[in-house]
C-alpha cells in the first residue's frame, strides 16, 4: 500500500515517471489527454495517507532511515537523483504575444478584420476594372484596421496584470532547511530535501516539506492558508485524528511554525506534498468562457448571419436586375460591411473599463474586464467565513459571572458600554483576564482606537487584552502594579494557563491566576465568587456553570474559564516559585466566571445577504471552521434565516430520530466535510437543489472545488470568495473568483478574477449590482448602436433595387459609427440602474442573451425603420427642392453616374452636368447623415430605460446630455467647416433641412413610451414577450 493508502490514489513519493511504449502520434495525444483527465480526478480526491498512524519503528522501516542520525549523505544523494528536487512544477504559461494576439484577433475583432479585408478586396476589384475608382473602400479598410488595433492594444493594456499563479508558490518556498544527515546537523537548500530526511523546525521557520513529527516541544503551526483555521494549531508526535489534515503529528509544506521546536521525517516533497497537489489542482483546472465572451460570440454569429443573408439576397437580386457580376460582388461586400457596427468593439471595451474603475472606487479591484459582467450573472455565491463574512479578529462576545450572562459589544466600533461594571466579581474577572495574559499592544499606537491597535500574542489573548483595556482600565498599568513572578504557558495537554503576580496592596503576598478550558478550570476550584463573596462549590453552581457553558458554546463561541487563589503569607515577596517542580498550592482555587469569544460578523453582511436573497442569489457558506461556529455565524448573517431549521433542530423539536424527519421540513442544512468525503455527485446535487440555505463546514480544498463544480453542474453561475491557499482551486474553477485584498494569500489573489480591497462581503453585492448594471447598459448601448444600422443599410439597398442616386455614402457611414454614435453609446455606461435591478432573478446565460431576437426586432424592425423613413424623407425633400421629383428618380442611377453625360434633365427640364449632380448627391448624403443624428437623439433617450418611463428615470445622466450635444456639434462641424466638401464630401445644409427629422424623433419617443407603458401594465403580456429586450 502506497503512502496515500488506497488503490487508485496518487502516492506522493512515487516520483519516478513510468515508461510507456512508443505509439502513434494521435494515440499519444489521446493517452495524454486521458492521463491529464485522470490526474485531475485523482487530485480532487481527499488527501489519503497512513504515515500519521505508523509507529516510529514502522516509519523508520518504511523510509529506511535512522530516526536519530537521518540518511547518510550517499543515500540522500541517491534519493535526490531518483525522486528529483523538492520543488513545485510551474504550469505552462501563456506567452504575452499570444495574449496580445487573442485581444487583436479574438471575438468581435475578427468581425472587423473580416470587414477590413472585404473592403480591401472590393477596392482591389475596382482598381482592376476601373480607371478612376473611388477610394472609399480603401479608407474604410484602413479605418477598420486602425479601430481593431487601437482597441486591441487598449484591452491588452487593461488585462496585462494577468494571473501568474505559480509565482507566489515560488515565493512561499523556504530557501534553507535544517536537516540531520549522518548524525550531523546541516543547512541545505530546500530543493535538496529528500523523502525520509530528518528535519528540524523552530518558531519563525517555514516547513520545507510534508513532515511526520517524531518529537516536539511547544510547537504550534499556522495552517490558516491551507485549512482556513484562524488559530495556530498545536503539533506533537501523537496520532490524534484519522484525517491527516487534522491530526497533530503532521506538518505541511510551506505552512509557518509559529512557536516551539519539532523534529520530523519528510513524507512527501514537491508536487506530492499537500500544497503541491493544490498547486497542480489550481494550475491544471480548465477555465470556461466568461458569460460576456459567450454573449459577444453569440452576437457576432447573429450579426454575421444577418449580414451574409442580406448580402447574398441582394447579390442575387442585383444579378436578376441586370447588374454585372463585378458590380454585384461590390454590392455584396458593401452590404456585409454596412452591417458591421464598427464602433461597438470600442464601446464595449470602454463600458467595461469604466465599470471596472467605478468598482475600484467601491473597493472591488477587477483583474479581468469580462469578470465585471460575470458578477452580474451570478446566481450562487460560495463564500468563505473567516474575514469575509466576519471581521477576522476574535472579539469578546459574552461573559458569565454572578450567575448571569452578560453581552459584550462586538460591533466594529466597539464602544464597550453594554453591561454593568459595579460588581466585585467583574473587577476580579477583568484583573485575571488582563494579568494572566501574554498578549501586548505593539508600540506607538496610542492615537489609534483600541479595536484597531496591533497586538503580539494569539487571537484569543489579544481579544481579552483589547476588551479589558476598553471595559476596565489600562492593562499596562495593572501589570506594572502586579508584576508577574512565575508562569505556566497554555499547552494542549494541560489546557490551562497559570501566572503568579505580586499583589498591589502592601501585604507583599502573591495571587495565583488561571484561565483555560472551562471544565479543566472547574476541576481546580473548591469555591466560587458571587457578588464579590466567596462560597463553597455546590451542585447548584455546577449546574448553572454547565448550562452557561453549553449556551455560550452552542453560539459557536470559544469559552474560557477564570479562577484565582490568594496565596498564603508564607509565599511572600522573593519566594522562588518553581513551575517545573511545583512548590506552591494549585488546588482549592476560587472560580470567578466565563468569557466567550467569537470572530463576529461584519456589520454590513446581514443586509448584503438579504439583498442577495431578494436578487435571487443563493449564498452558501463554505468554511474550514467547526460546524457549530459556522452555523452560529450563518444564523447571525442570515445565510440561515430566522425561523429556518436544520433536520437536527426539527428532530430535537419534535423529539423524533433524524431519519424520520421530512426532508422538505428542513430548509437549512449544515454539511460536515467528513460527510462530503464519500458522497456521490447525485447526492451532492440533491443537497444543493433541495436546501435553499446551506453551510459546508470543515471542508478541504478538494471539497470546495467539488462544491463549486456541483453548483455549475446544476447550471448556476458561481462566484467564490476566499483568502487562503486552500481556496485557490475553487477560485480558479468558479465563473468568477473573488479574493481578499487584506487577508488574502498571494496565491488566492492570483487565482481570482476580482479582489475585494476591504475584505467585505457587502462589496460583492455592490459588485453584483454593478455587474447587472453593466449588462443592462451594454444592452442599451448595443440597442442604440444597432438601430442606426437600418438607416445605413437601406440607402444602399434602395440604390440597388430602385436605381436611385446613392442616399448615403461609405464615408458618411463611418462618420456615424466612429464619430457621432461613439460618445452617446459610451454615455449609456453612465446610466443609473432602473429600480428593479436587484429585485429580479439572475439572468439565465442560456436564454437571456445580450443580443436576442427581441433586441434585433426593436432595433432593426421598429425604431430603425422609423429612422430610415426620416432619412429618405429628408433625401427626397432636398432632391425635390432641386427639381427631381421622387417618381422621376426611379431607375436614374446609370445616367446619374455617367461621367460623360452633362445634360441630364430634371423633372422641370433643367439640365445638370455630372459635377452639379454630384454636389446635389453629396448634399443629400450630408442631410441623410444629419437626419440620422437627429433621430438618434430620440433613440438615445429611449435607450435610457428598458421598462421604466423616461419620466420615472429622469435626465440625471450628465454624460448622456453631453453625448447629445457632442454628436450635434460634430455633425454641424462636418457639415459647415470649409474644406469638408473636398476631404469628406460633406456640404453645408439649410437650417430647414435639419428640421425634417424632428417629427420622426417625436414619433420614436412617443411610440416607445407607449410600448413601455404596456409592458408595465401587462407583465408577461404579448408586448413584453415580443419587445422587452
From Swiss-Prot:
Annotated catalysed reactions: K(+)(out) + Na(+)(in) + ATP + H2O = K(+)(in) + Na(+)(out) + ADP + phosphate + H(+)
Name of one Pfam family that matches: Cation_ATPase
Basic residues biased stretches: 18-36
Cellular component terms per the entry's GO annotation: cell projection; membrane raft; photoreceptor cell cilium; plasma membrane; rod photoreceptor outer segment; sodium:potassium-exchanging ATPase complex; sperm midpiece
Alphabetized SUPFAM superfamilies for the sequence: Calcium ATPase, transduction domain A, Calcium ATPase, transmembrane domain M, HAD-like, Metal cation-transporting ATPase, ATP-binding domain N
Tissues where the protein occurs: Specifically expressed in testis. Found in very low levels in skeletal muscle. Expressed in mature sperm (at protein level).
Topology in the lipid bilayer: Multi-pass membrane protein
Binding site for Mg(2+): 723, 727
Protein activity control: Specifically inhibited by an endogenous cardiac glycoside, ouabain.
GO biological process terms held by the UniProt record: cell surface receptor signaling pathway; establishment of localization in cell; fertilization; flagellated sperm motility; intracellular potassium ion homeostasis; intracellular sodium ion homeostasis; monoatomic ion transport; potassium ion import across plasma membrane
Topological domains, Extracellular: 117-139, 317-328, 799-808, 873-924, 977-991
Transmembrane segments: 96-116, 140-160, 297-316, 329-346, 779-798, 809-829, 850-872, 925-944, 958-976, 992-1012
Positions of region (Disordered): 1-37, 223-242
Alphabetic keyword roster: ATP-binding, Cell membrane, Ion transport, Magnesium, Membrane, Metal-binding, Nucleotide-binding, Phosphoprotein, Potassium, Potassium transport, Sodium, Sodium transport, Sodium/potassium transport, Translocase, Transmembrane, Transmembrane helix, Transport
Active-site residue list: 384 (4-aspartylphosphate intermediate)
Entries under Gene3D superfamilies matching the protein: Calcium-transporting ATPase, cytoplasmic domain N, Calcium-transporting ATPase, cytoplasmic transduction domain A, Calcium-transporting ATPase, transmembrane domain, HAD superfamily/HAD-like
Ranges of the Cytoplasmic topological domain: 1-95, 161-296, 347-778, 830-849, 945-957, 1013-1029
Family: Belongs to the cation transport ATPase (P-type) (TC 3.A.3) family. Type IIC subfamily.
NCBIfam families (alphabetical): ATPase-IIC_X-K (TIGR01106), ATPase_P-type (TIGR01494)
Biological role: This is the catalytic component of the active enzyme, which catalyzes the hydrolysis of ATP coupled with the exchange of sodium and potassium ions across the plasma membrane. This action creates the electrochemical gradient of sodium and potassium ions, providing the energy for active transport of various nutrients. Plays a role in sperm motility.
Subunit structure, as described in the record: The sodium/potassium-transporting ATPase is composed of a catalytic alpha subunit, an auxiliary non-catalytic beta subunit and an additional regulatory subunit.
Name of protein: Sodium/potassium-transporting ATPase subunit alpha-4
Lineage of source species: Eukaryota, Metazoa, Chordata, Craniata, Vertebrata
Gene: ATP1A4
Amino acid at each position: 500500500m502506497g503512502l496515500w493508502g488506497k488503490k487508485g490514489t496518487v502516492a506522493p513519493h512515487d516520483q519516478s515517471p513510468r515508461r510507456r511504449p512508443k505509439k502513434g502520434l494521435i494515440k499519444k495525444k489521446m493517452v495524454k489527454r486521458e492521463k491529464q483527465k485522470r490526474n485531475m480526478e485523482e487530485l480532487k480526491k481527499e488527501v489519503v495517507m497512513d504515515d500519521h498512524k505508523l509507529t516510529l519503528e514502522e516509519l523508520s522501516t518504511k523510509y529506511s532511515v535512522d530516526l536519530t542520525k537521518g540518511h547518510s549523505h550517499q543515500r540522500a544523494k541517491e534519493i535526490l537523483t531518483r525522486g528529483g528536487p523538492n520543488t513545485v512544477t510551474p504550469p505552462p504559461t501563456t506567452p504575452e504575444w499570444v495574449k496580445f494576439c487573442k485581444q487583436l484577433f479574438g471575438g468581435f475583432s475578427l468581425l472587423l478584420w473580416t470587414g477590413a479585408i472585404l473592403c480591401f478586396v472590393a477596392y482591389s476589384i475596382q482598381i482592376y476594372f476601373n480607371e478612376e475608382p473611388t477610394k472609399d473602400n480603401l479608407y474604410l479598410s484602413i479605418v477598420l484596421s486602425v479601430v481593431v488595433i487601437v482597441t486591441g492594444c487598449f484591452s491588452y493594456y487593461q488585462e496585462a496584470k494577468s494571473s501568474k499563479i505559480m509565482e507566489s508558490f515560488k515565493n512561499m518556498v523556504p530557501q534553507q532547511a535544517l536537516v540531520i544527515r549522518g548524525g550531523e546537523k546541516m543547512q541545505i537548500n530546500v530543493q535538496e530535501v529528500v523523502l525520509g530526511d530528518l528535519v528540524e523546525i523552530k518558531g519563525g521557520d517555514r516547513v520545507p516539506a510534508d513532515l511526520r513529527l517524531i518529537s516536539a516541544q511547544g510547537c504550534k503551526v499556522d495552517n490558516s492558508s491551507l485549512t482556513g483555521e484562524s488559530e495556530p494549531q498545536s503539533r506533537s508526535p501523537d496520532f490524534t485524528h484519522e484525517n491527516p489534515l487534522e491530526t497533530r503529528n503532521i506538518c505541511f509544506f510551506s505552512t509557518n511554525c509559529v512557536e516551539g521546536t519539532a523534529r520530523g521525517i519528510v513524507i512527501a516533497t514537491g508536487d506530492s506534498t499537500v500544497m503541491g497537489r493544490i498547486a497542480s489542482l489550481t494550475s491544471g483546472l480548465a477555465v470556461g468562457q466568461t458569460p460576456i465572451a459567450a454573449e459577444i460570440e453569440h452576437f457576432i454569429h447573429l450579426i454575421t448571419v444577418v449580414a451574409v443573408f442580406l448580402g447574398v439576397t441582394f447579390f442575387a437580386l442585383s444579378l436578376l436586375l441586370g447588374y454585372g457580376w463585378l458590380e454585384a460582388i461590390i454590392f455584396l461586400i458593401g452590404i456585409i460591411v454596412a452591417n458591421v457596427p464598427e464602433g461597438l468593439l470600442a464601446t464595449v471595451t470602454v463600458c467595461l473599463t469604466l465599470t471596472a474603475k467605478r468598482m475600484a472606487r467601491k473597493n472591488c479591484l477587477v483583474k479581468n474586464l469580462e469578470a465585471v459582467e460575470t458578477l452580474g450573472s451570478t446566481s450562487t455565491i460560495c463564500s468563505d467565513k473567516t474575514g469575509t463574512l466576519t471581521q477576522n479578529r476574535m472579539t469578546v462576545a459574552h461573559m458569565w459571572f454572578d450567575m448571569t450572562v452578560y453581552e459584550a459589544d462586538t460591533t466594529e466600533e466597539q464602544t464597550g458600554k453594554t453591561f454593568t461594571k459595579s460588581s466585585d466579581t467583574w473587577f476580579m474577572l477583568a484583573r485575571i483576564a488582563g494579568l494572566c495574559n501574554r498578549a501586548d499592544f505593539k508600540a506607538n499606537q496610542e492615537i489609534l482606537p483600541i479595536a484597531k491597535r496591533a497586538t503580539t500574542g494569539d487571537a484569543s489573548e489579544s481579544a481579552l487584552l483589547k476588551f479589558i483595556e476598553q471595559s476596565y482600565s489600562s492593562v499596562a498599568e495593572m501589570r506594572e502594579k502586579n508584576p508577574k513572578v512565575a508562569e505556566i504557558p497554555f499547552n494542549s495537554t494541560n489546557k490551562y494557563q497559570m501566572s503568579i503576580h505580586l499583589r498591589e496592596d502592601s501585604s507583599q503576598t502573591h495571587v495565583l491566576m488561571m484561565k483555560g478550558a472551562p471544565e479543566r478550570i472547574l476541576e481546580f476550584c473548591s469555591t466560587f465568587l458571587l457578588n464579590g463573596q466567596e462560597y463553597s462549590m455546590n451542585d447548584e453552581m455546577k449546574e448553572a456553570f454547565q448550562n452557561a457553558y453549553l449556551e455560550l458554546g452552542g453560539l459557536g463561541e470559544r469559552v474560557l474559564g477564570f479562577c484565582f487563589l490568594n496565596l498564603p503569607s508564607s509565599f511572600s515577596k522573593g519566594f522562588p516559585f518553581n513551575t517545573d517542580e511545583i512548590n506552591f498550592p494549585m488546588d482549592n482555587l476560587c472560580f470567578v466566571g466565563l468569557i466567550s469569544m467569537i470572530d463576529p460578523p461584519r456589520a454590513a453582511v446581514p443586509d448584503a445577504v438579504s439583498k442577495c436573497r431578494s436578487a435571487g442569489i443563493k449564498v452558501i457558506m463554505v468554511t474550514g471552521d467547526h460546524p457549530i461556529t459556522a452555523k452560529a455565524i450563518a444564523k447571525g448573517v442570515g445565510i440561515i434565516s430566522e425561523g429556518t431549521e436544520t433536520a437536527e433542530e426539527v428532530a430535537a423539536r419534535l423529539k423524533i430520530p433524524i431519519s424520520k424527519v421530512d426532508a422538505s421540513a428542513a430548509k437549512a442544512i449544515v454539511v460536515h466535510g467528513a460527510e462530503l468525503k464519500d458522497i456521490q455527485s447525485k447526492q451532492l446535487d440533491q443537497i444543493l437543489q433541495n436546501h435553499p440555505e446551506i453551510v459546508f463546514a470543515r471542508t478541504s480544498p478538494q471539497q470546495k472545488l467539488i462544491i463549486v463544480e456541483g453548483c455549475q453542474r446544476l447550471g448556476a453561475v458561481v462566484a467564490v470568495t476566499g483568502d487562503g491557499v486552500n481556496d485557490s482551486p475553487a477560485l480558479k474553477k468558479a465563473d468568477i473568483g473573488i479574493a481578499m485584498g487584506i487577508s488574502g494569500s498571494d496565491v488566492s489573489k492570483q487565482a481570482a478574477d476580482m479582489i475585494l480591497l476591504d475584505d467585505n462581503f457587502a462589496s460583492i453585492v455592490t459588485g453584483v449590482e454593478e455587474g447587472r448594471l453593466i449588462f443592462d447598459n451594454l444592452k442599451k448601448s448595443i440597442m442604440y448602436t444597432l438601430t442606426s444600422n437600418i438607416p445605413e443599410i437601406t440607402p444602399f439597398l434602395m440604390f440597388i433595387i430602385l436605381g436611385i442616386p446613392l442616399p448615403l455614402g461609405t464615408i458618411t457611414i463611418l462618420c456615424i459609427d466612429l464619430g457621432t454614435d461613439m460618445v452617446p453609446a459610451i454615455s449609456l455606461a453612465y446610466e443609473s440602474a432602473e429600480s428593479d435591478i436587484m429585485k429580479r432573478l439572475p439572468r439565465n446565460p442560456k436564454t437571456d442573451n445580450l443580443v436576442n431576437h427581441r433586441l434585433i426586432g426593436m432595433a432593426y424592425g421598429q425604431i430603425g425603420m422609423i429612422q430610415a423613413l426620416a432619412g429618405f424623407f429628408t433625401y427626397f425633400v432636398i432632391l425635390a427642392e432641386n427639381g427631381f421629383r421622387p417618381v422621376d428618380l426611379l431607375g436614374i442611377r446609370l445616367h446619374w453616374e455617367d461621367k460623360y453625360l452633362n445634360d441630364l434633365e430634371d423633372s422641370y427640364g433643367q439640365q445638370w452636368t455630372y459635377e452639379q449632380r454630384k454636389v446635389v448627391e453629396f448634399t443629400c448624403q450630408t442631410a441623410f447623415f444629419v437626419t440620422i443624428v437627429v433621430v438618434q437623439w430620440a433613440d438615445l433617450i429611449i435607450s435610457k430605460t428598458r421598462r421604466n418611463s423616461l419620466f420615472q428615470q429622469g435626465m440625471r445622466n450628465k454624460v448622456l446630455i453631453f453625448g447629445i450635444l457632442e454628436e450635434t456639434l460634430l455633425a454641424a462641424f462636418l457639415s459647415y467647416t470649409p474644406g469638408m466638401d473636398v476631404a469628406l464630401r460633406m456640404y453645408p445644409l439649410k437650417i430647414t433641412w435639419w428640421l425634417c427629422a424632428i417629427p420622426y424623433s417625436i414619433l420614436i419617443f412617443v411610440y416607445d413610451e407607449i410600448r413601455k407603458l404596456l409592458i408595465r401594465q401587462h407583465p408577461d403580456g404579448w408586448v413584453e414577450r415580443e419587445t422587452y429586450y
